[in-house]
Amino acid sequence: MDGLTCSLTYEGGELVSAETRGNGLVGENILHNVKVLPSIPKKIPYLKKLTIDGEIICTYKDFENFSEIYSTPRNFASGSIRLLDSKECSKRKLTFVAWDVITPFYDDYQEIDFLSEKLRNLRNMSFTVVPFIRATMKEVSHVESFISDIQWMAEECSYPIDGAVFKFNDCAYGRSLGETEHHFKNALAYKFYDDVFLTSLLDIEWTMGRTGALTPVAVFTPVNIDGTEVNRASL
């Protein structure tokens, strides 16, 4: 999905927190606006702590009325959910689409540790969940064969989807694979379209991550990508 990533937290069945992804550790508080979105349940029949990751998006139809002001549905959703005026935000018909559960998730006394089951349980609680397909794939070629089907699904969808993520359904196995400096090893991201932009390289800087690993960052003349000015990128 192409929108703004955020996390919702429920405690005792009540929505208590909503934050953007931010820098990965600390996000921006958007609870005042999330509470006015009809697509987000304010109460759920689940009393344990529950943190849900998802995306704030705008459908193509709802974006039509604002296309002269905002360049893309993504920029529209990102700007609207940050408004100080919740009444204005409520008029913009944003939608939250859930795609993962971060905290342990239980069905009665047994932990749910399969992603497909987590998403089905969220759907039963009236959340909108990301479209997904369960498949058995033993080779990379099997992944590639699914891409055209997923692209077709994206084209038929009512909101922007710019790629797909392949994840292990067994969450415990996925966690056992660990992570790199940039991403978890249990997932493979695929972008549908490769946009090419002409720019000039100005410099290469080095940044140090939390584990001490150095990452080169390209600094280049600004280019406009989906309405956003970009002048840096990790190599």
List where the protein language model places each region.
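RNA/tRNA-interacting regions in translation and RNA-turnover enzymes
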Residues: M1-L235
